[in-house]
Structures are given as structure tokens and as C-alpha cells.
């Protein structure tokens, strides 16, 4: 038990040493890091459910998460104001379209990856938006999460 706690503490300190400078720098580097972390989180959630991410369903889920996390309208200027939501919707439409044309892939199979990509992607998007609004707002959001997490 103590060994696991020590391992988690060391990993948290190492992650903070990498994450805090990225948060201070902000910009594209933070957005890419948040997108990769969101994809890692969805990968873990899919594995917990017994789903493989190296399938079309898993790859579309990772793409949907990344599309929702990153403010795409900053980089793809032809997209409307909520470009990441539009891109997310297109990927979800493809996933739901697969349920129509496949006998082995039902709507029940598609719901969990869609829900996880929305939940994780929107959460990381909120952190990216908070950082765009200012470092103080991003730190406040993180302190709230860390305070509630440490009490659990």
C-alpha cells in the first residue's frame, strides 16, 4: 500500500514538473499536450470497457476526442466559430453511420465511445479555453480539481 502511494506521489511530481511549464507557456504546445492527454484518457477508458483502440471505432473515438479538445477554428480558418464541435459532429456522424451499414456494430456499441469522447474531450477543451482566457483562470480550475481529488 505504501509502495503504491509512493509511486503515485513520484509520478504526480514528475507530471507536474512537465505540466506546469506547459501551462505557463500555453499556446499550441499546451493544446497539443491536452489533446494527447485527452486521447490517452479515452484510450484508458476504452481499455477498461474491453474495447481496442486500434480498430476503426477506437481510432474514430480518439480522433473525435482530439477534434473536440483542440480549438480547431484557430488553425483551420475556413471552419465556423465552433469548428471543433463541427469536426466532432462529423466524426460522430461517421461512427453512427457505421451502425447502419454493419450488422455486427450496433448503436449500443457506439454509445460508450461517443459518450467518453464527449466527456473527456469537453473537459480538456474547458481547460484549454480557461488557459486562453488567462493563466489565473486555468490555475483556479486546476486547484479546484486537485482540492476535490485530494479529498477523495
Q: Locations of the language-model features?
A:
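Membrane-embedded alpha-helical bundles of polytopic integral membrane proteins
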Residues: 2-152
Amino acid at each position: 500500500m505504501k509502495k503504491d502511494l509512493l509511486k503515485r506521489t513520484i509520478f504526480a511530481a514528475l507530471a507536474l514538473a512537465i505540466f506546469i511549464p506547459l501551462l505557463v507557456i500555453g499556446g499550441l504546445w499546451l493544446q497539443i499536450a491536452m489533446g494527447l492527454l485527452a486521447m490517452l484518457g479515452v484510450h484508458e477508458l476504452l481499455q477498461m470497457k474491453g474495447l481496442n483502440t486500434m480498430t476503426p471505432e477506437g481510432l474514430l473515438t480518439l480522433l473525435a476526442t482530439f477534434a473536440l479538445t483542440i480549438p480547431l477554428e484557430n488553425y483551420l480558418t475556413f471552419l465556423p466559430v465552433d469548428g471543433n464541435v463541427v469536426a466532432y459532429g462529423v466524426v460522430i456522424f461517421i461512427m453512427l453511420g457505421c451502425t447502419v451499414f454493419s450488422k455486427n456494430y450496433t448503436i449500443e456499441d457506439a454509445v460508450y465511445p461517443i459518450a467518453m469522447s464527449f466527456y473527456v474531450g469537453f473537459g480538456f477543451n474547458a481547460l484549454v479555453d480557461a488557459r486562453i482566457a488567462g493563466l489565473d483562470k486555468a490555475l483556479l480550475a486546476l486547484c479546484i480539481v486537485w482540492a476535490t481529488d485530494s479529498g477523495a
